[in-house]
């Protein structure tokens, strides 16, 4: 027998599939306003090749809520094309000066084992990196020790956490500068792909010239760093009243997710494993967890706690 939640998810998936794929028309992203109208903030035919600052009009539509010290979070209803016609963006901003970060490794019985149910008292927790079979892809450093060697790919990025609490972003797959310091200055590190923004908010050419699949839609989870040094998180969820249907892996394209991160002020950004892996927990100001669950367990998570 199929459970109620699973049945609901299947029903939504079949409905979206029946709508058919979206072609390469001039796609857009807009905020869905309470009035029923929408406010456009991105169009593919006019997409910036570089985001030098946040979109102040878009930021003005976001109501930020306090989480634990150092964390703000928000949700924003948006509309894209096709199956992305009704999505919710889940957003978070973290001040590393008020946080401590750790990676959680979870392989049990040769299988991934982490979900946000293990987040405990974390101020924020989410799946980290990209996953290949049962393991994270690429470089993983935990507690100053290298757990996995670096991966190589032109569209990869890395987040490095230093022993003094600072965060360093690495564009590209060359982590040699930091790898040699893994048992000293580096407390944790992980890689992921594809890169969404690099340098000073530049959209990689591969996201603009057709080198990647620009039409594929999926539930997305992205991580970035803004010019104030804050860590940015953005997740897409299907906006549906059907219980559990928000976890259906429909959402934005990779170029659209780059636009989301750029519009919210990211200077650097990368995707994390999305689809059925994407999951996020945020503890509000009184310690109650806001949870966006995934559909499968993962081997690696980034966990942030208030204080050092």
What are these regions (language model features)?
Residues 3, 10-27:
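Bacterial Sec-dependent signal peptides at the C-terminal "C-region" and cleavage site
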Residues 19-158, 166-169:
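Zymogen propeptides
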Residues 87-89, 119-121, 191, 218-220, ...:
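Extracytoplasmic
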Residues 111-115, 178-183, 242-251:
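A short, polar/proline- and glycine-enriched secondary-structure boundary/capping micro-motif
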Residues 127-215:
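Active-site-adjacent helix-turn-beta-strand microarchitecture at beta-sheet edges
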Residues 135-154, 161, 208-272, 276-308:
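Conserved, well-ordered active-site substructure
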